[in-house]
Amino acid sequence: MERALILAASAIGAGLAMIAGIGPGIGQGFAAGKGAEAVGKQPEAQGDILRTMLLGAAVAESTGIYALVVALILLFANPLLNLL
């Protein structure tokens, strides 16, 4: 019974952790749109704008990657099961 409860709570926690993937998707879309807008206004600064946009996208994506790691740990290498 306790094991089933821990597994169920872990599955729910993994699902909630994956909700964090929504934020990076929205942020990267917003950054790409603003980057395209900036290149349209100043085509000569395309290299600098692209570099800054890619750095921002990498930082935003790290949140989604951390959420994926937490979800995978909860599902496949659950440390809470060792407490039983």
UniProtKB/Swiss-Prot annotation:
NCBIfam families: ATP_synt_c (TIGR01260). Inhibited by dicyclohexylcarbodiimide; the enzyme is protected from inhibition by Na(+) in a pH-dependent manner. The record marks I65 as: Reversibly binds sodium during transport. One of its GO terms (cellular component) is proton-transporting ATP synthase complex. This is ATP synthase subunit c, sodium ion specific. It is found in: Cell membrane. F(1)F(0) ATP synthase produces ATP from ADP in the presence of a sodium gradient. F-type ATPases consist of two structural domains, F(1) containing the extramembraneous catalytic core and F(0) containing the membrane proton channel, linked together by a central stalk and a peripheral stalk. During catalysis, ATP synthesis in the catalytic domain of F(1) is coupled via a rotary mechanism of the central stalk subunits to proton translocation. Key component of the F(0) channel; it plays a direct role in translocation across the membrane. A homomeric c-ring of 11 subunits forms the central stalk rotor element with the F(1) delta and epsilon subunits. One of its GO terms (biological process) is sodium ion transport. Coiled coil: none annotated. The gene is atpE. The ATPase of C.paradoxum is of special interest because it uses sodium ions instead of protons as the physiological coupling ion. GO terms for molecular function: lipid binding; proton-transporting ATP synthase activity, rotational mechanism. SUPFAM superfamilies: F1F0 ATP synthase subunit C (SSF81333). It comes from the Bacteria. Keywords: ATP synthesis, Cell membrane, CF(0), Hydrogen ion transport, Ion transport, Lipid-binding, Membrane, Sodium, Sodium transport, Transmembrane, Transmembrane helix, Transport. F-type ATPases have 2 components, F(1) - the catalytic core - and F(0) - the membrane sodium channel. F(1) has five subunits: alpha(3), beta(3), gamma(1), delta(1), epsilon(1). F(0) has three main subunits: a(1), b(2) and c(11). The alpha and beta chains form an alternating ring which encloses part of the gamma chain. F(1) is attached to F(0) by a central stalk formed by the gamma and epsilon chains, while a peripheral stalk is formed by the delta and b chains. It is a multi-pass membrane protein. The keyword Cell membrane applies.
